[in-house]
Amino acid sequence: MRFLRRFFQLESSSGILLLIFAMLAMSLANSSLKSHYFNFLDIPIVMQFGTFAIDKSLLHWVNDGLMAIFFVLVGMEVKREMLEGALASYRQAVFPALAAVGGMVVPALIYVLITRSYAELSNGWAIPMATDIAFALGVVALLGARVPLPLKVFLLALAIIDDLGAIVVIALFFSEQLSVPALTIAAFSIFGLLVLNRMKVGHLCGYLLFGGILWASVLKSGVHATLAGVIIGFSIPLKDRRGNRLLHAFEHTLAPWCSFLILPLFAFANAGVSLGSINVASVFSPLPMGIALGLLLGKPLGVFGFCFLAVKLRLAKLPEGVDFKQILAVAVLCGIGFTMSMFLSSLAFGGESTSTINTLSRLGILLGSGLSAVIGYLLLRAFTKPAEN
């Protein structure tokens, strides 16, 4: 028990847990238990209330349900940083914002250039845009006090803006044919959340009620359900009517569940890549190469390039105590797409988890993310000094 308590208190524990669950999924997907693993993910689960029903496989419940809860946390984090954190002013936000834009645009361009001759792969351009903040911060935490605090804050702010970009991409490009009745119910739910926000209600029950209705209606509307999570997160007031820091309290409560349950389960459900049908030629085919190079080369080129230009053009300043070599190391770590890239892959290509296109997409994510983690760690270790006692 003491060991477990100490483990969960480590900064790197969430990243380690993600890696363990991803490796477990890979092991099962390439063992004699392969069919049981994929059949387990395809188990149908039905939620019914009168004539209203949601019939999804376990995999879809993880991707549409549990990840919506994760995006509630994302919404709260973004709101807090915009109100009183690293994004609270133009001067604070401009440097990580430009870095995030570069880190989204360049990987997408590299993917498009590599896959431009294959129309069936065109939907995957957003996959290498993402950064898995839990994994990236987990790698940074392995170096402990060697890493300057301003550099950690820069990475966190960059990743939060990256999440905002992912939210916009999901809303604009991965919504299906829209249902007006479902959107109408969603609008009423949002109104209810706004009323709770304006009244600074401090009880969780109202947010859960309207949030649950919002999630179900958005799921049925054709807009991806994770957007409901973001809206719920933004609806939580910074303080309740008594002055209690409500947003911080909810965020503090939800964060461990996301780090130690939801994201590991997502990794377990999505990282299982069966390598039986994959050969050397397929590894170097356009889809995995477009994703892997987008993450491994596009992310550092975009993040570092935009940072360098921003400083040289005097649009922004380097964080205090941080140099360009350290920015380069963090830029490489931003290539750890992992869970967020897999999530965008599931939206881009859908279909069965065992389909060839999904297998190759996940292979590219694992290659790009894994190499980015190793190279980023080595660079950051080389470019930082041991902390003085």
Curated annotation (Swiss-Prot):
InterPro entries: Na/H_antiporter_dom_sf (IPR023171), NhaA (IPR004670)
Membrane-spanning intervals of the chain: 7-27, 58-78, 94-114, 125-145, 154-174, 176-196, 199-219, 260-280, 291-311, 327-347, 363-383
Primary location class: membrane
Highest taxon of the lineage: Bacteria
Localization in the cell: Cell inner membrane
Membrane topology: Multi-pass membrane protein
Gene3D superfamilies: Na+/H+ antiporter like domain
Keyword Cell membrane: yes
GO cellular component, one term: plasma membrane
Gene Ontology BP annotations: regulation of pH
GO molecular function, one term: sodium:proton antiporter activity
Sorted UniProt keywords: Antiport, Cell inner membrane, Cell membrane, Ion transport, Membrane, Sodium, Sodium transport, Transmembrane, Transmembrane helix, Transport
Similarity field: Belongs to the NhaA Na(+)/H(+) (TC 2.A.33) antiporter family.
Role of this protein: Na(+)/H(+) antiporter that extrudes sodium in exchange for external protons.
Record's protein name: Na(+)/H(+) antiporter NhaA
Organism, scientific name: Actinobacillus succinogenes (strain ATCC 55618 / DSM 22257 / CCUG 43843 / 130Z)
